Structure formats: C-alpha cells, structure tokens
C-alpha cells in the first residue's frame, strides 16, 4: 500500500518520499535483528506504528504523498538513535535494501528537518510518546 501511495509521485520532496517504503522495511527488519539494543525496540516499534496511523501529524489522507515526510523524518530520527545506541551504523547497513547509502540518507533527512517538518518535531514526538527525547 505504501509503495502504491507514492508510485509516480514527482512533487515536493519526491526524492526522499520515494525512500519511505525502504525506510519502513528497514525498521521492520531491525526488530528481528538480535544486535538491536533492547532499549531501541520501543523506538523502532513507534516508527513502524507511525506509518500506519491514519491521522498522524502530517496525514497522508489530507496531504497526499507529501504527508509521508513526518514518517520518514521519524524513521531517520530512530535510525540515528539506533546508531548511537549500538555504537556503529553497521546494524542499519545490514538491514537496508535501498540503493542509496542509508547513513547518507539518514543524515540528509535530519539535516533537512526544518524544511521537511517545520516546527512539528515536538508534536510528532509527543504524539508517539517520545517527547522525552
């Protein structure tokens, strides 16, 4: 369904929005990786769940494919936390099936936070109970 939602999208942030299915798959694979620090499981689960919430902070029903920018931002945030907790990006690389290097993608998304989600970071984190981070 996610791939169908973004299929053919060529609008704003399309180069990043096209990464949404791959980021989602990486999050699901991380849950099965025994190297994932246990403390990271709730964050990974939150990122997965956020993709399926119909009325998240930037809802796809209202904004179309550009509504995935908050979902991809959250995945990048969680991926960065996983790197910090595990001490290496290896776990991400091992679970990544995208063409673009995952660490580069995560960095770009985080660097473009304001452009992608504006001032909505705090609301996104509160929505999923991660406002302490």
Regions found by a protein language model. Name each.
Residues 32-52:
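Transmembrane alpha-helical segments and their cytosolic interface motifs
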Residues 1-39, 77-133:
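Terminal, membrane-proximal amphipathic helices
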Residues 24-25, 42-43, 56:
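A generic alpha-helix surface/boundary motif
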Residues 47-75:
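Membrane-inserting effector segments that mediate pore formation, membrane fusion
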